Amino acid sequence: GLQATFQDLGITAADLARFPDYLVCIPPDRNDAPENANLMEMLSSGLPVKVLVQTSDLLEEASIGTGRFAFGVRSARLATAAMGLGGMFVLQSPSANLVALRAQIGRGLACRGPALFSVFAGSPRSASHLPPYLSAAAAMQSRAFPAFSYDAAAGGNWAARFSLENNSQPE
């Protein structure tokens, strides 16, 4: 069966334990889908859900009344809003910076509570003359989508919990 397949691939029980119990992936074209309207409520529930929200537009409408971005906040502010809920791991980063944040991503996946990963995938080629990877890097350098992580379990104060990773001039 399935267990034999995992064994054939050399995947151990310890390897499987590293995967999240619940993984929700929301691609850029589904950010405004009605089923995502309760994302913040789900994150604040304490369930061990890991949520990856990708966005490709930093300038979208933020109003719930417009039917855009069902989370109720602009994509560039989603991670900041989630930090305000407390009690979870939050990581925001452009796709161009994800390899540099692999240790933080691992911590977020390993945490026992909820985690939000908000990733700017870059602007589509039709919106920019740059490949999406380069527009994502430019968004970080310009501070339009800075990289940071917030780990509520990392300590008793903001200095221990919050980190600006790899941003130019983080002060």
Label each residue range with its predicted role.
Residues 1-65, 76, 80, 89-103:
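Thiamine diphosphate
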Residues 2-3, 11, 62-80, 132-151:
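Acidic, Ser/Thr-rich peripheral helices and adjacent loops at domain boundaries
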Residues 6, 19, 69-71, 89, ...:
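Phenylalanine-focused residue identity feature
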Residues 107-171:
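Glycine/aspartate-rich loop-and-adjacent alpha/beta segment that forms the canonical ThDP
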